[in-house]
Swiss-Prot record:
Biased composition (Polar residues): 20-29, 510-519
Entry keyword annotation includes Membrane: yes
Function: Slow, weak voltage-dependent S-type anion efflux channel involved in maintenance of anion homeostasis.
Keyword annotations of the record: Cell membrane, Ion transport, Membrane, Phosphoprotein, Transmembrane, Transmembrane helix, Transport
Cellular component terms (Gene Ontology): plasma membrane
Record organism: Arabidopsis thaliana
CDD domains: TDT_SLAC1_like
Stretches in topological domain Cytoplasmic: 1-140, 207-220, 269-281, 326-340, 384-389, 446-519
Subunit relationships: Homotrimer.
Region (Disordered) location: 1-31, 495-519
UniProt-recorded name of the protein: S-type anion channel SLAH2
Gene (UniProt): SLAH2
Lineage per the UniProt record: Eukaryota, Viridiplantae, Streptophyta, Embryophyta, Tracheophyta
Length: 519
């Protein structure tokens, strides 16, 4: 005899109605009691769908974060997973293949094949990435090294306002040093925030940082944190410290020197990372570090060290300037969306002008030559209004701020040497334009970061595959049949009786009249 008490309260919705029907047909007296029990209780069925509320979204985000494809970029999880698999004796082929795709060193040619644009950060159509394309990646994977451009823009403003407050020619403006003080602390906090975030990325996702360093364009931004520290040292208010120790200069310039030896050596090596192939306006960041270091060293009273770095910067700036202006076939034309990087042309000569002024203790001929070059490049870019229209906001817009501020600071130095109404007006206009640009770009950055939340999209640069997309079998077969066998390839004679192998494209079209005459 069936006991209704033996029925489990956890009954699936597919069979609880059948249970009631069987009890009804059997005429059991306990049917009403069973029906009341089932109807009165708010029973929880195993197949019941859970509500899609905030808790569900948190669980979904957690599952996305724990995607195994993200683990391949983690610093320790990939090694630990492989060790566990080896201990179990079951290393899966897919995991080994995914690990190979991540850890295999990417060549410069692979970046050029998979990406496009002046900064090589746009994925080509037929390329695939090793991370999910339809999901938002963890924030650290989306935080690029190019974020240090914000630090360059704000810290350079601290230098400019310090120069305005301490220059005799600009005393009529009555600029207080409080502005320099506030901007310096903002720059320091911003640099700490960006550095701590990128440090966590280095610790947790070292493979992503390694891929950025091997990127032929992104590698130039590894100079940005060092240059930002140099700018903080140059813009530090006198109320905080009046004289910096010279040992700080050696401590800051040592990593810049080692990084330059690697980058400049690759430019001259003639390999995949030769300058004629990777030349880009962002390469000016590696040049600016020399002039900024020379400016700081000369401000500290040093002599030989600043001249050494100034000479290196001058030599490589001339080489880079000529290479970029040549527009070699290996360099693609810059599209409209990333035109802000053009303003990096202005940064190096502007900082070089101020550096040589400190080295020579006067705004002499060398300083004026560098300043006039930067001023001409500045106005030649500003006059091209089309550069400022038709592209969306991104971190690349910060390329406007630092060069414009550098030219404004050099103009203030020039107005102090060549006094006059025109130079004073020019310095005020340049300083105002630089300040308004920084305010506008900073406001847009805050809006896109916290309101629209699209400032940091998925960074496809770090997720490209180490292998090129495989071609279709029929295409390979056609290519092999057409050009694979040299002996079966027909040969014809050109008018000079030279044999032309049809294997090598382009194919030669034979004139019909020539064929008739030969017949």
């Amino acid at each position: 005899m069936n006991n209704p008490r033996s029925v489990s309260p956890l009954v699936s919705p597919a069979n609880h109605s059948d249970l009631l029907e069987n009890q009804r047909q059997s005429g059991s007296g306990d049917f009403s009691r069973l029906e009341k029990r089932i109807g009165a209780r708010k029973m929880k069925f195993h197949s019941k769908s859970m509500p899609r509320g905030a808790m569900f979204l948190d669980q979904e985000a957690s599952r996305n974060f724990h995607d195994k494809r993200y683990d391949l970029f983690r610093t320790m999880s990939g090694k630990l997973e492989r060790q566990i698999s080896n201990l179990r004796g079951k290393p899966t082929e897919s995991s080994l293949q995914d690990h190979k795709e991540i850890t295999e060193s990417l060549t410069a040619d692979r970046y050029f094949d998979a990406l496009q644009g002046p900064e090589l950060e746009t994925l080509k159509e037929k390329e695939k990435i090793v991370l999910p394309e339809d999901k938002t990646w963890p924030f650290l994977l989306r935080f690029p090294i190019t974020s240090y451009g914000m630090c360059l823009g704000v810290s350079s403003q601290a230098i400019m306002w310090k120069t305005l407050a301490t220059t005799e020619a600009e005393k009529f403006l009555h600029v207080t040093q409080v502005i320099n003080h506030v901007l310096w602390w903002i720059s320091l906090l911003l640099l700490l925030a960006v550095s701590i975030t990128y440090l966590f990325k280095t610790i947790l996702f070292f493979e992503a940082v390694r891929r950025e360093f091997r990127h032929p364009i992104r590698v130039n931004f590894f100079f940005a944190p060092l240059i930002s520290i140099l700018f903080l040292a140059l813009g530090i208010p006198h109320s905080i410290i009046s004289h910096l120790p010279s040992t700080l200069w050696y401590f800051l310039m040592a990593p810049i020197l080692f990084l330059e030896m690697k980058i400049y050596g690759q430019w001259m090596s003639g390999g995949q990372r030769r300058l004629s192939k990777v030349a880009n306006p962002t390469n000016h960041l590696s040049i600016v570090g020399n002039f900024a270091g020379a400016l700081l060293g000369a401000s500290m009273g040093l002599k030989e060290g600043p001249i050494f770095f100034f000479a290196i910067g001058l030599a490589y700036y001339l080489v880079l300037f000529v290479t970029l202006y040549q527009r070699l076939p290996t360099n693609e034309t810059l599209p409209k969306e990333l035109h802000p990087v053009f303003f990096l042309f202005v940064a190096a000569p502007a900082v070089a002008s101020m550096a040589w002024t400190k080295i020579s203790a006067s705004f002499d001929l060398g300083s004026r030559l560098a300043y006039f070059i930067s001023l001409f490049l500045y106005f030649s870019l500003v006059c091209r209004i089309n550069l400022f229209r038709g592209f969306k906001f991104s971190l690349a817009w910060w390329a406007y701020t630092f060069p414009m501020t550098a030219v404004a600071s050099a103009t203030i130095k020039y107005s102090d040497e060549v006094t006059g109404v025109a130079t004073k007006i020019l310095s005020v206009v340049m300083s105002g334009a630089a300040t308004l640009t920084v305010i506008a770009v900073l406001g847009l950055t805050v809006m896109h970061a916290f309101v629209q939340r699209d400032l940091f999209p998925n960074d496809v640069v770090i997720a490209i595959s180490a292998e090129q997309p495989k071609q279709k079998r029929w295409f390979k077969h056609l290519t092999k049949e057409s050009y694979g066998n040299n002996e079966r390839c027909p040969k014809i004679l050109d008018p000079e009786d030279n044999q032309i192998d049809l294997e090598s494209p382009p194919l030669v079209n034979v004139d019909s009249s020539t064929v008739q005459n030969s017949n």
